């Protein structure tokens, strides 16, 4: 139980996939203008990350490794992620048509979000991870992505009404804000030993 808690805290704060490992930066910068959109995408991404971590672990452990087909890992994981994203898209469309319209093109683009493939590949490289650890890592990565995306969206909403000097408006202030958030998350680096 302690190991799972450490994996969760590590994925959310210490080794945050967005601010520490720089994965998932496209949706981080692109969908963070409004907090409602950020919440919707973060929930969908967390769901996809968790399911993709589960499915890719099963694929790696019970198909690719026993059959000595590990060289097909990336292609297999991309196919698994595509199926999980399609399932998520259908689920969101049925349960929340408004959220489906708000997310628009960003929902199918979760397939190409590098954080999803990155988590699957990192889990596959950790041979000591069992099913629960891989799932916890995926869920923690999703929670970390959600935390950072919602915080960044809230900051961008505040910055949008602030008096920002002309040269810093738009992407420039966004990058500065992301850098400051990354520095803040560096403070968690001593929380969990490697």
From Swiss-Prot:
<dbReference type="GO" id="GO:0022900">
    <property type="term" value="P:electron transport chain"/>
</dbReference>
<dbReference type="InterPro" id="IPR003667">
    <property type="entry name" value="NqrDE/RnfAE"/>
</dbReference>
<feature type="transmembrane region" description="Helical">
    <location>
        <begin position="135"/>
        <end position="155"/>
    </location>
</feature>
<comment type="similarity">
    <text>Belongs to the NqrDE/RnfAE family.</text>
</comment>
<keyword id="KW-1278">Translocase</keyword>
<keyword id="KW-1133">Transmembrane helix</keyword>
<keyword id="KW-1003">Cell membrane</keyword>
<comment type="subunit">
    <text>The complex is composed of six subunits: RnfA, RnfB, RnfC, RnfD, RnfE and RnfG.</text>
</comment>
<protein>
    <recommendedName>
        <fullName>Ion-translocating oxidoreductase complex subunit A</fullName>
        <ecNumber>7.-.-.-</ecNumber>
    </recommendedName>
</protein>
<dbReference type="InterPro" id="IPR011293">
    <property type="entry name" value="Ion_transpt_RnfA/RsxA"/>
</dbReference>
<feature type="transmembrane region" description="Helical">
    <location>
        <begin position="39"/>
        <end position="59"/>
    </location>
</feature>
<feature type="transmembrane region" description="Helical">
    <location>
        <begin position="4"/>
        <end position="24"/>
    </location>
</feature>
<feature type="transmembrane region" description="Helical">
    <location>
        <begin position="72"/>
        <end position="92"/>
    </location>
</feature>
<keyword id="KW-0812">Transmembrane</keyword>
<keyword id="KW-0813">Transport</keyword>
<keyword id="KW-0249">Electron transport</keyword>
<feature type="transmembrane region" description="Helical">
    <location>
        <begin position="102"/>
        <end position="122"/>
    </location>
</feature>
<dbReference type="Pfam" id="PF02508">
    <property type="entry name" value="Rnf-Nqr"/>
</dbReference>
<keyword id="KW-0997">Cell inner membrane</keyword>
<dbReference type="GO" id="GO:0005886">
    <property type="term" value="C:plasma membrane"/>
</dbReference>
<feature type="transmembrane region" description="Helical">
    <location>
        <begin position="172"/>
        <end position="192"/>
    </location>
</feature>
<comment type="function">
    <text>Part of a membrane-bound complex that couples electron transfer with translocation of ions across the membrane.</text>
</comment>
<dbReference type="InterPro" id="IPR050133">
    <property type="entry name" value="NqrDE/RnfAE_oxidrdctase"/>
</dbReference>
<keyword id="KW-0472">Membrane</keyword>
């Amino acid at each position: 139980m302690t190991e799972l808690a450490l994996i969760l805290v590590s994925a959310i704060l210490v080794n945050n996939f967005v601010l520490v490992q720089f994965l998932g930066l496209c949706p981080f910068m692109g969908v963070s203008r409004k907090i409602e959109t950020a919440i919707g995408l973060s929930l969908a991404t967390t769901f996809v990350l968790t399911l993709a971590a589960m499915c890719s672990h099963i694929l790696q452990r019970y198909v690719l490794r026993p059959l000595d087909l590990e060289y097909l890992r990336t292609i297999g994981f991309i196919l698994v992620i595509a199926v999980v994203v399609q399932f998520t898209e259908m689920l969101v469309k049925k349960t929340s048509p408004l959220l489906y319209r708000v997310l628009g093109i960003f929902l199918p683009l979760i397939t190409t979000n590098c954080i999803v493939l990155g988590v699957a590949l990192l889990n596959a490289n950790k041979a000591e991870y069992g099913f629960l650890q891989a799932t916890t890592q995926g869920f923690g990565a999703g929670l970390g992505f959600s935390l950072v995306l919602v915080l960044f969206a809230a900051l961008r909403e505040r910055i949008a009404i602030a008096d920002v000097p002309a040269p810093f408006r738009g992407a420039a202030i966004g990058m500065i804000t992301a850098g400051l958030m990354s520095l803040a998350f560096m403070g968690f680096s001593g929380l969990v030993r490697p």
